[in-house]
Amino acid sequence: MMRLFARVMLAMCLAVVVGFHAQAQTKPKVTTSGPDFPKTALFVGNSFFYYNNGMPGHLSFMERAAYPENKAAYRNTMATIGGSGLDWHDMENLLRAGGLGAYSFDEQNNVVFNKPGRQYDAVVMMDCSQCPIHPQLKDAFATFARKDSEIVRAHGMRPVLFMSWAYADKPEMTEALAEAYTIAGNANDALVIPAGLAFARVRKLQPELNLYAPDKRHPSPAGTYLATCVTFAALTGRSPVGNSYTMGLDAPTVELLQKAAWDTVQEYYGL
């Protein structure tokens, strides 16, 4: 009887500890990009962005599907280096006048020269897949998240951080990355896009759906689509559920990923 009582008490204590840690997880301070959400964005990062023909391009298609009356307003650009951290990018140079975004292509593949001046409403930044939690690289993440956020604001744009996902065979990365990005977002008054948490959610909901390329790091087409849905939801504040842009995926997969993305964003922001 005493042994049974001791086991029950231990289980209760463990439950309290687990619950406490779940509640103690850092919460984001910035939970919206504002009523005038960014319609043009520069994505600065690495191959996690450019896999599968580029997540930012898929985001443009999703935004245009949601707001067909003003398609021309939505434009996203990538500045990516394979394997790079934020410290590999020269943010000041990327945002120089007359540089990136000076022209783009419309849906008919015509070159469009954009109005001179500020080319983007927001800059979405992602560090290398391990950098925010790597013992030798995490300090650089904090330093450049701060430095680059200041540069972005100095150019009249909004800084946004993109929370990357855990490797397929290292799910324990999820919580550490979520914490690192949330802390950095809070320190710099920046919105954080919780893509990594959405990956973890889908892996629990439907483990057989492969979100990864064979290297277990980069996204499969389904992974890129999920990241697109999360980014759409975070930046616009609008649900991706029912959006007609599917990236060629089958209907059940699209429905699952759209809903998982929206649920993740609402839960992370506490909405």
Describe each region flagged by the PLM.
Residues 1-10:
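Bacterial N-terminal signal peptides that target proteins for export
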Residues 9-19:
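Bacterial N-terminal signal peptides
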Residues 20-24:
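Sec/Tat signal peptide C-region and signal peptidase I cleavage site
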Residues 25-65:
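N-terminal module-boundary/linker segments of secreted carbohydrate-active enzymes
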Residues 35-38, 49-57, 135-143, 171-175, ...:
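Soluble non-cytosolic domains of exported or imported proteins
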Residues 50-136:
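Conserved SGNH/GDSL esterase-like catalytic core that processes O-acyl groups on lipids
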Residues 107-224, 233, 240:
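Alpha-helical cap/lid subdomain in secreted, periplasmic
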Residues 218, 228-271:
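Conserved catalytic region of serine esterases and O-acyltransferases that act on ester linkages
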